[in-house]
């Protein structure tokens, strides 16, 4: 028969069992317990599919023969008792059988084995007849055919299968050996694909019904019931495993789960970008373009419509709605962003923070002025983060603690005090005051409206007041919003002759601090804070001084500006350049790099920018902030500044 790994465990026990049974030294009690124990282990192994049905049938048959040879029978056998070593049983022992209990009754087994009562030594034939045992033992148990009887193959019936007898087995005569068992005790033909192509046994396929198969596989052949003696209980077959059932909750498949997980990650990233009112870059367009085409009808995610297609650019520089980016700005590319009404997640106005977008049209405001503000004064530049502002570490920390945190988390404010709604940045020109205002809008996820005080003052008192009121109304209509008014001192002339915008400005500032202006932050910048009167100064709850950049900040600004020109300086050259630009503002450092690029292009040769070009430009560009002005700014900060 074919070898399978499931034979390993039972066959490892055969040499020990054979030696114990055939030896004359063990006690009769030990020989009494050995065959039933082996039979129980065989039952257990077969019931748990550790061995095949063919192996179980062979082992059980041998155990039955051994057990019949061990028991003591009342009827004497034919002939005298042999003294050979292979004869065993109670009658082969010189001492009586000392069993604690009477012999195990197996009347039905004896009836099925007629030769068991005729010869008490027939048990060894079942053990020695296994070719597996003969192959496992180091020496053959029986050599040759010394007994002189006929071979086992001629003595047994054809259906028994003489191939299971060892070639060296000492066969006996018909009178001494037990007759072959009936066909009902033998194993049926193995299932298809197992063992030889032709079946060794031919038995009727009777037995219990086949169990349902697993999935689409055909069920295995069921072993018939009559292959065991009637006295041995057949092991209970294990139930076949149930076919797979779908999940009760309908979970998606593996591929769908991966896509859902990726979708959740994308939504999480989108939620993080929603906080700052911009999103990551879109997927490539269907036509193969690197980025999707920009929509000319909408501006950067803030709900305000851009200028009409045929509008001119006259008002851009006039009102400060857009212009060339400063050197401290973020990279030139800005991803396309969704309309602002997609991101209404704000703290309710009842807590004093930013309110939900109202969507109601402004009342009492000129529609033409509101359209002008929505088209030309909304900043559409890229978002600015804290890292885009070089230096100013103490100022950033103060803004986070005193302004951003109360606005974004109003319940954390002590008492019933409302968070600040106005902030003033003052300092020398070109120090990044407007850049800080843009950064606040990004941190708050708010719409940014930019107004230039000089442009409003130049448009006249009536037109300037109309535009100023329209800007505040537009900010209130679409909160959260940040209204950035640069050059605030231009709106407050030294002489109040009725043509200034002081009164409309104070009125709008008072309205921005009331309950109607929830979600609006007003940011004013000036380089001459001393020009502000006391009434205007008190309208700004927070006042911060933006100083000139220090050495580390100047090095960072120079590296960014020169990298845009394709120039990379080594550490020594950069340190020398930082030392030579002491007292420069961020704007002046940007002008220095532009002048160096112009110096490199004068020669007409396409060569990269070098340190010599920067040195040549440094001789032409110098610091413009006098020390007297810097001292006055420091004094004003000590008197009226919020301190940081």
Curated annotation (Swiss-Prot):
Binding site for ATP: 390, 430-435
Domain of life according to the entry: Eukaryota
Protein's recorded name: Fidgetin-like protein 2
Species of provenance: Mus musculus
Annotated Pfam families: AAA
Molecular function via GO: ATP binding; ATP hydrolysis activity
Catalytic activity reported: ATP + H2O = ADP + phosphate + H(+)
Main location: cytoplasm
Keyword Hydrolase: yes
SS bond list: none
Required co-factors: Mg(2+)
EC identifiers of the protein: 3.6.4.-
Family listed: Belongs to the AAA ATPase family.
Keywords attached to this entry: ATP-binding, Cytoplasm, Hydrolase, Nucleotide-binding
Ranges for region Disordered: 1-36, 285-323
Record field: compositional bias (Low complexity): 285-294
PANTHER family noted in UniProt: AAA DOMAIN-CONTAINING (PTHR23074), FIDGETIN-LIKE PROTEIN 2 (PTHR23074:SF33)
Gene: Fignl2
GO biological process: microtubule severing; morphogenesis of a branching structure; negative regulation of axon regeneration; negative regulation of cell migration; negative regulation of wound healing, spreading of epidermal cells
